């Protein structure tokens, strides 16, 4: 039930069997049938849950929120819109400091607005201009943990998405728990004697 979590499905390939010499010259098959070669992420939308929190956002349709890591400069993408306010002390020319508040994820990565800049929050109750971005090719997005993905050269262009954003909602996981449990039981039966 992790908000914004995307299901992953394994991709298998068949292995060729080959014969190897056994004891007394007997031919024995060697191989295990199949092996997992990759996982395919399911980016389909899931149900929205109302939270009432002003810093929660959900995407209706396709697209991703963009997160900027101020420590590394990395931009990552997520469907998890459970954001919070993150403070930053800025020193002015006269030596005094101002506290700026950014809309950020739980790790301090700043949410980007519709122009691709970190969102500075001046009114915590107001709707923020949260950007939603479309990635040309979803195949090849690199999963970096916590429901976040980074683009690679294979992904092509990234642009603003026309998808609607709802404040006070979060998108649930798109994993069908009943289906997944059925697959676990099916896999266990495959290997039982």
Task: Set out the residue ranges of the language-model regions.
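Amphipathic alpha-helical polymerization modules
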Residues: 1-99, 104-193
């Amino acid at each position: 039930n992790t908000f914004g979590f995307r299901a992953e499905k394994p991709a298998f390939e068949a292995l060729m069997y080959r014969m190897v010499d056994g004891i007394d010259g007997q031919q024995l098959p060697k191989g295990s049938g199949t092996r997992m070669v990759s996982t395919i992420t399911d980016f389909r939308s899931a149900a929205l849950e109302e939270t009432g929190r002003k810093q929660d956002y959900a995407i209706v349709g396709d697209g991703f929120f963009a997160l900027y890591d101020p420590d590394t400069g990395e931009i990552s993408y997520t469907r998890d819109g459970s954001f919070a306010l993150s403070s930053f002390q800025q020193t002015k020319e006269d030596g005094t400091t101002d506290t700026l508040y950014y809309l950020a994820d739980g790790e301090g990565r700043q949410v980007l607005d519709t122009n691709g800049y970190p969102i500075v929050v001046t009114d915590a109750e107001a709707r923020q201009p949260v950007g939603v971005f479309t990635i040309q090719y979803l195949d090849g997005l690199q999963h970096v943990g916590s429901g976040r993905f980074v683009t690679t050269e294979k992904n092509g262009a990234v642009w603003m998405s026309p998808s609607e954003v709802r404040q006070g909602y979060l998108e649930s996981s798109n994993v069908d728990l009943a289906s997944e449990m059925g697959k676990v039981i099916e896999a266990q039966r495959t290997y039982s004697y």
